[in-house]
């Protein structure tokens, strides 16, 4: 057990996400003591029998990951276009077998890519540079969010990151209500995978009004995934990249970085953000 924070184990409900191992510490190199590490395994997504992508991920919440990935990558537009899903655990990793509608599978074969990435990587193996940034439909302006309500959400973020609190090794993605409460969240060793899990959960729960908060930086792919799923506001704890800002500007997504209590850097479309408690 992590001797510094044994209480954190009470919040880890899925023991497959972390494992205790004997380790040496700088202050005592002669003996080992148990500490917790996050699990990381290869997860293959297979559509209608054809391997599409291999991601390094935390081995939990895999069905909603597959749903979120399928939605955020534009493979499907609705969960109704997925007819079935099986998760196969093997010696070398995990395979998620997804059955698509025939129309969606035909479209997927036309633009099929096959990649084996680093943790959460979604670019490695893309066949053409033009495939990196997909065309995105402009998002509507249907909601606002109070920056004052963001502070409360930031304080709650650790509640959806128990493995991260225990190991210091995961990213989190959370769905914020307009009131600044966290409706739900997911964590993973890969920031893209954490976001895909959240987007899959959002589709299942039919969350509409609100925003996404991620514990990581905002890359272009995080923006692309969020926008593809119709998310209008994306908050990141760390910075955004130039390509992320360009993509967000083009698709009308409100992108905010350095989201910390009492501060934030707004990169694009600030008109969705308001000062003061929206409920006041």
Curated annotation (Swiss-Prot):
One GO cellular component term: cytoplasm
The entry's keywords: Cytoplasm, Molybdenum cofactor biosynthesis
Gene name in the database record: fdhD
Identification of the protein by name: Sulfur carrier protein FdhD
Origin species: Cronobacter sakazakii (strain ATCC BAA-894)
Localization in the cell: Cytoplasm
Biological process terms in GO annotation: Mo-molybdopterin cofactor biosynthetic process
Ligand binding (Mo-bis(molybdopterin guanine dinucleotide)): 258-263
Coiled-coil intervals: none
Function in brief: Required for formate dehydrogenase (FDH) activity. Acts as a sulfur carrier protein that transfers sulfur from IscS to the molybdenum cofactor prior to its insertion into FDH.
Active site: 121
Coarse class of the protein's main subcellular location: cytoplasm
HAMAP family listed in its UniProt record: FdhD (MF_00187)
Superkingdom per UniProt: Bacteria
An example molecular function term from Gene Ontology annotations: sulfur carrier activity
Protein family according to the UniProt entry: Belongs to the FdhD family.
Pfam families: FdhD-NarQ
